């Protein structure tokens, strides 16, 4: 009670302080609001933001004071037309002035962006009272020269093939029906043409349901249909291939609901159905997938909760009535440390804590080691601010991992101390020390191991807040510098051991204006050869041709390492692929000429017509057999056999992660996972050789010997204490490995889909996207955490856990078949590389995804108490000021749990899981968020959350009572749709940008104007 009163006084003081700040003068001729964010407890360091408003109350200029590297101000400008509509949105400029007159701003802006004459985005509106956007120009003169995103507002028509739409429905028995085509004029159609003239259509009915999403490849349609029942429940999603072969089992997502509109049954294409059971509080209590149903015992997964709806236990049982035959997988404890009396916790390694700081938080977890009776025990300790200051976790090697964090005033880590012990092994203690600049940006990361402190990385920023350079091991010799274009897209990485140039609308390839990379060049390691690729794409932005060449013009030694996809099916499954490589000591040619045979989205056979093979065991597809069914799958869509690799069986655990790979010659690869999805061990038995690898947090053992300690920038070899660093490209691919002296130890060159076509040295296994490559026994799988990827085929081996976010695409495809511009950090979702700050991105753990934004958990050690790695620099430093309430909920596909995360980015607990589809997906942020802050919807900030079958989750804000939902079309800069509550449903109120600011005078269209209550469910 005493603590609560203290907190109340604190909030009152803050409110008065904020009021006082808003009355201070900045520019006497304009209205403004000043916000001061304190950076230290004494109030001597702070960041000021001043927002100026015109006479109509519209924000038109924002000044971030002294945030640049030169201690200047960063200023943005928003212009409006005579109708009050937002028009030119100017990129920020650097200025020493407290206020910049618009004319002066516009005259100086080009010099901040390489003298580009159009450093602003510009919407064009139609001449109607609806004020709908018909064109949107991105920043940059090149885009204003005819490369806009165009929007046309149409109606469906039976006389036009591109505007025709089949009228699917659901019978009273729940079956799919086809009722011809919709009559002309019954549907609203939005046609979108991107900067490269790629066309897509969205068809919406009078209820606001999206019934068809159509993408065009020339004149060929790729249609995804959404079919609803009379209660507006989404019952079927028909993939594009369904129009070629009407097979629901192979090409449809199917859903069934109970009388309370809860999804109780669903089926993904090519997989068995899943059942879900709820209690009277609408909580998921039982679920069963296809593999569980196929077991003799008929296993179910059960979920238990406490009185506050927090998940307390999850496991498997033999029926859905009682938890008989229980196998507990995970347990969670909250509020206190009474769990210390239980086995596993009742020892001195888990101290008591009587402070009460853990009240309302997760204080401990137990995760079973799958396939055994062993368990991992974890306890979390908090300070008075609710921050995790200590984590203690047992490990499978008979020891413990203890992490202690000291925070700055702004809740960023100042030091993190990690101690690792294991039975009979050397104790390892490491300390990370973080330093920040005057704008609270990360400036330096130091690492201490064995008492010796070194600098892992130094960071420098340009005046626009972008990372300008990074130096490794405290040496200017190991420095990488970064360059950007007017849109903030990375165009160059330059260093003595690795350089890369990326071209979009420039360079020697066909110019691309929609963000796709048209060509790139690079030079790696000690080589003098400049290598490169030119890229072409189809109308769906899928990679077609990657033409290899050398020199800056990519015009010599062409096609030596080209990789071309010559055909896709409508779901994006690769049908034919050609790959070139080295065939002899000085010869190059076609090494793969592949034809894929598919059964639905699943692969059944691959045939290679190439006569030559890769030289000296190089990367290629190995055509091991010639028979009808070379690949087989289980009821969950997991690959169980790959005869071309000589794999006779692959078995999986309850998380759809492999437990064993068995080869026809008796060789095996065994995997051990925790019930939270953490990989703990692999055992390779190849012939007479056995290699055991233990993953104990960031300490890697090989055959019982401590081998590597992974760091934020590379790793330490524990045999000699030497540091090694990764030099990464724009995707986070490890291109070069150098030692602490700057000597090149490894250089890698990649095909676009991830195969290593040439390398020098092979000192460590982390390669493409920074993922561990298992090449033993010719497996050649990359471990993405949630699933494995086969770069020779350009396919994942198992179904995408987030397949329901990508209805139009095969659940086995890699990165929407655009591997140059996207990556899949955990094997669960696709992220645009331009939306990720790769300079600080650790692909083993960093990803922002899901419920609103999801976080991955780095490893078994760092869950609760770990900062949820920033999607971009400065994210957590600003996001707290834009959340509706303290904290947000995030989901981790890697661990299958949902985590609670505070506005400081620290994971604080486990939240209940829900079982209604579709699963949430990745949220994307841009570089602009480093200077503007990201607004986010949260469950904690909402008094109520309801689900719409196609528009997603609606949140009722505690602060204003309005209902918010993410805008799926995002026309006119809109990121959110905002609704007012009425007796009959939700009525459109305003649109808002991604920062939660209302867009002035942006009028509604007839799409989504009103959402009746019957379309919404809990």
Model regions and ranges:
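Beta-strand-dense domains in secreted/periplasmic systems and polymorphic toxin scaffolds
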Residues: 35, 62, 89, 136, ...
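Short, well-ordered junction/capping motifs at the entry into regular secondary structure
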Residues: 110-118, 189-193, 267-269, 288-294, ...
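A motif-centric feature for acidic-aromatic and gly/ser/thr-rich catalytic loops and repeats
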Residues: 236-238, 242, 255, 409, ...
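Short turn/helix-capping motifs enriched in Asx and small/polar residues
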Residues: 323, 741-755, 777, 785-787, ...
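Surface-exposed extracellular loop regions of Gram-negative outer-membrane beta-barrel proteins
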Residues: 46-64, 92-109, 227-240, 250-290, ...
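Bacterial Sec-dependent N-terminal signal peptides
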Residues: 1-28
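Catalytic toxin/effector domains delivered as secreted proteins or via bacterial secretion systems
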Residues: 881, 892, 896-909, 917-1018
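Hydrophobic, gly/ala-rich membrane-insertion helices/peptides used by toxins and envelope proteins
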Residues: 830-834, 839-934, 938
